[in-house]
Design a protein with these regions (language model features):
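Charge-rich, well-structured scaffold segments of protease-associated domains
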Residues: 1-12, 90-241, 308-310, 314-462
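N- or domain-start disorder-to-order transition segments that initiate the globular core
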Residues: 2-47
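Extracytoplasmic/periplasmic mature domains of Sec-exported, cell-envelope-associated bacterial proteins
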Residues: 7-9, 13-19, 48-54, 62, ...
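Short, surface-exposed beta-strand/loop micro-motifs that present aromatic residues
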Residues: 26-27, 34-39, 200-203, 254-260, ...
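Extracellular/periplasmic catalytic domains that process cell-envelope and extracellular macromolecules
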Residues: 29, 42, 206-207, 262, ...
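His/Glu-based metal-binding/catalytic segments typifying zinc-dependent metallopeptidases
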Residues: 35-56, 61, 67-71, 240-298, ...
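M16/MPP (pitrilysin/insulinase) zinc-metallopeptidase core fold and M16-derived inactive scaffolds
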Residues: 49-119, 182, 295-311
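Short, conserved active-site entrance elements at the starts or edges of catalytic domains
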Residues: 229, 247-248, 303-304
């Protein structure tokens, strides 16, 4: 029976509008950091990102052999305490009066200090921002309070199986002397030993001339160069040079490591393999390959383990970025009783991309997902500034985002498959399983992929 409704045909998506990543204008503050100014008309919230080459990869080892693991993260937290002992609340209030927000964090590569503020108040906010980064208190009492808070954060991180799996993956793939083998934010033992003097010495060794200050937003009518010069001119290091960044490469070998969590009803799985860093011409194709495998609900890992087998709520795959290398990682949680089956099926999919290649449809879908989302992904000044800060921290140049997107679009199914085969050996994967060792170790051993070793979870270690 006809409804009599005259339905209009479904709209057909039009072509993707031409778009290019915003270009920045490079400069330098006299006797200070490099600058990168990016004018984004209509973005009335400005974003400032100061990149200091003082990440966890440059944390020193003292003469007595004590490693200052976690001092970069603790320093980032301590900057938010302001220029006076116990001044964190007053500093937050001062930024709030300007409608601004201030935060900082550290990773292996860099310590990044951030400011978001309406463009009309950018000069005043930059003045306050400069006071904080040039003359922070880094007070003993504040640092010890932050140590206690950081220890609580570490305990929370240990309770998360995904975080625990990634930490174990790095610990296994990198040798113990490599900084990347240990938690970026430090261990409970290393963090508990940190004092205010350690934080002050570390921050005093920062070389401002090696830093980069990125400013993005609608900068019309704002003397950004003048404000940056007033903020940072003459800023100099006061301490001994930091050690060179650690560049130890990962070891890609077939192994299965079980992190024991007795009674766990799920197993968190992580599959890892070393790949080149982002400066390598194969990185964009590796990103496409990772997306084909685990970039969405229709990806190969999800189609098999979620949709067909019902083992998991979702798997994902991607590239872990470090300055000197990368890691291909596939991960997700599965039911305990199907752990070995899930590993077997995941390995089959990881092998299948190498042996069978990629078809045009899934390649096209992944390219569109990675490249066509860029206009929305970089809609805000915050996103643009964060990306420019990241490429600066990794020595890639401000034209890298555009070159990366162009390379993704120019990739081909055969080229992506060849790149994957060149850099990812499915027979040399590190497999981490965070779960009940009593229930999953023997089935994993029976797979015959690699010898299974068991390490205690945090509660057992205590």
């Amino acid at each position: 029976m006809s409804s009599g409704l005259d339905l209009q045909p479904r709209p057909v998506p039009g072509p993707v509008p031409a778009w290019a990543f915003p270009a920045g204008v490079a400069g330098r503050v006299p006797a200070g950091p490099a600058t990168l100014r990016c004018d984004l008309p209509g973005r009335r919230l400005a974003a400032v990102r100061l990149v200091l080459h003082a990440g966890a990869g440059r944390e020193p080892v003292l003469a007595d052999g004590r490693r200052l693991d976690g001092v970069a993260t603790l320093t980032a937290h301590a900057l938010a305490e302001g220029t006076e002992p116990g001044g964190g609340t007053a500093l937050a209030a001062a930024f709030e009066r300007l409608g601004a927000s201030f935060f900082a964090h550290a990773d292996l590569t860099a310590l990044r200090v951030a400011l978001d503020v309406p463009v009309t108040r950018l000069p005043a906010a930059l003045e306050l921002f400069a006071e904080v980064v040039r003359r922070p208190a880094l007070d003993d009492a504040d640092v010890r309070r932050l140590v206690r808070e950081r220890l609580e954060e570490i305990a929370q991180e240990d309770a998360d199986p995904g975080t625990r799996a990634m930490r174990e993956l790095r610990a296994v793939m990198f040798p113990p002397q490599a900084r990347a083998s240990r938690p970026t934010g430090g261990t409970p033992e290393s963090v508990d030993a940190l004092q205010g003097s350690d934080v002050r010495a570390f921050y005093g060794s920062v070389v401002p001339a090696e830093a980069t200050a990125v400013v993005a937003g609608d900068l019309s009518g704002v003397d950004v160069d003048g404000a940056l010069t007033a903020a940072f001119e003459g800023w100099a290091a006061t301490g001994d040079p930091l050690p060179d960044p650690d560049r130890t490469m990962p070891d890609s070998t077939a192994r299965i490591v079980v992190v024991d969590r007795p009674g766990s009803v799920q197993t968190y799985l992580a599959f890892g393999h070393g790949v080149p860093d982002r400066s390598h011409h194969d990185w964009p194709s590796l990103a496409v390959a990772a997306h084909v495998l685990g970039g969405g609900l229709t990806s190969r890992l999800n189609a098999k383990l979620r949709e067909e087998k019902g083992y998991t709520y979702g798997m994902r795959a991607g590239l872990l970025r470090m300055r000197h290398c990368g890691l291909f990682v596939a991960q997700g949680a599965v039911h305990t009783e199907v752990t070995a089956d899930a590993v077997s099926d995941a390995l089959a999919e990881l092998r299948g991309l190498a042996s069978d290649g990629i078809d045009a449809d899934e390649h096209g879908a992944s390219v569109r997902a990675l490249a066509d989302r860029a206009p929305a992904e970089y809609e805000t000044a915050r996103a643009v500034a964060a990306e420019l800060a990241d490429v600066s921290a990794n020595g890639l140049g401000s034209d890298y985002p555009s070159a990366y997107l162009a390379a993704v679009r120019a990739s081909t199914p055969d080229g992506v498959a060849r790149t994957y085969r060149r850099h990812v050996d499915p027979e040399a994967l590190t497999v981490i399983a965070v779960g009940d060792a009593e229930k999953i170790s023997e089935p994993l051993e029976q797979l015959g992929y690699a010898t299974v070793t068991v390490t205690a979870g945090e509660k057992e270690k205590e």
